[in-house]
Amino acid sequence: MLLEFKQFLYEASIDEFMGKIASCQTLEGLEELEAYYKKRVKETELKDTDDISVRDALAGKRAELEDSDDEVEESF
């Protein structure tokens, strides 16, 4: 039962962090999330699939924010 609770907390933490990535609106905010992730990943054990998912989400959000910055610059 304790293992199930730990698994639940683990999954909730991953889901919460993925939500923060999804709701991030600025490159500065994304850089803070990336720095936090790089620090935290060294302190905890992540499943390979979760690590890949988080890294993909960070990269995807970076591309999205950089593309939106390019569109704003072009409109001036």
Swiss-Prot record:
Organism: Enterobacteria phage T4
Gene name for this UniProt entry: uvsW1
Role description: Inhibits the single-stranded annealing activity of UvsW, has no effect on UvsW helicase activity.
InterPro entries, alphabetized: UvsW.1-like_sf, UvsW.1_dom
Pfam (any one): UvsW-1
Keywords, ordered alphabetically: Late protein
Gene3D superfamilies given in the database record: 1.20.1280.210
Protein name: Protein UvsW.1
Subunit structure: Probably interacts with UvsW.
Entry superkingdom: Viruses
